[in-house]
Amino acid sequence: MATRDSGGQSQTGRSQQGEEIEDVTTEASPEVAERHAEITEDVDDLLDEIDSVLEENAEEFVRGYVQKGGE
């Protein structure tokens, strides 16, 4: 009788859920912290602009989005 070969490696039933992951904290340089603050502010401004457009005319925004190939 022929045996079936799975062709792959067998897996053991071991799980890594029990392993603890060590928390690592690093301090960013002042330049990195400043750049992070600038990017965060830019993103917040962009999100505020999107919110205002949606509050004013959400239907037109959605219609334009769908016409451009969005789902």
Curated annotation (Swiss-Prot):
Compositionally biased region (Low complexity): 1-18
Keywords carried by this UniProt record: Coiled coil, Isopeptide bond, Ubl conjugation pathway
Pfam families (alphabetical): Pup
Gene Ontology MF terms: proteasome binding; protein tag activity
Renumbered residue ranges of the record's region Disordered: 1-42
UniProt-listed GO biological process terms: modification-dependent protein catabolic process; proteasomal protein catabolic process; protein pupylation
Cross-link (Isoglutamyl lysine isopeptide (Glu-Lys) (interchain with K-? in acceptor proteins)): E71
Region (ARC ATPase binding): 27-65
Pathway it works in: Protein degradation; proteasomal Pup-dependent pathway
Any coiled-coil regions, as ranges: 31-60
InterPro entries noted in UniProt: Ubiquitin-like_Pup (IPR008515)
Subunit-structure text: Strongly interacts with the proteasome-associated ATPase ARC through a hydrophobic interface; the interacting region of Pup lies in its C-terminal half. There is one Pup binding site per ARC hexamer ring.
Family assignment from sequence similarity: Belongs to the prokaryotic ubiquitin-like protein family.
Function of the protein: Protein modifier that is covalently attached to lysine residues of substrate proteins, thereby targeting them for proteasomal degradation. The tagging system is termed pupylation.
Domain notes from UniProt: The N-terminal unstructured half of Pup provides a signal required to initiate unfolding and degradation by the proteasome but is not needed for pupylation, while the C-terminal helical half of Pup interacts with ARC to target proteins to the proteasome.
Listed name of the protein: Prokaryotic ubiquitin-like protein Pup
Organism of provenance: Salinispora arenicola (strain CNS-205)
Originating gene: pup
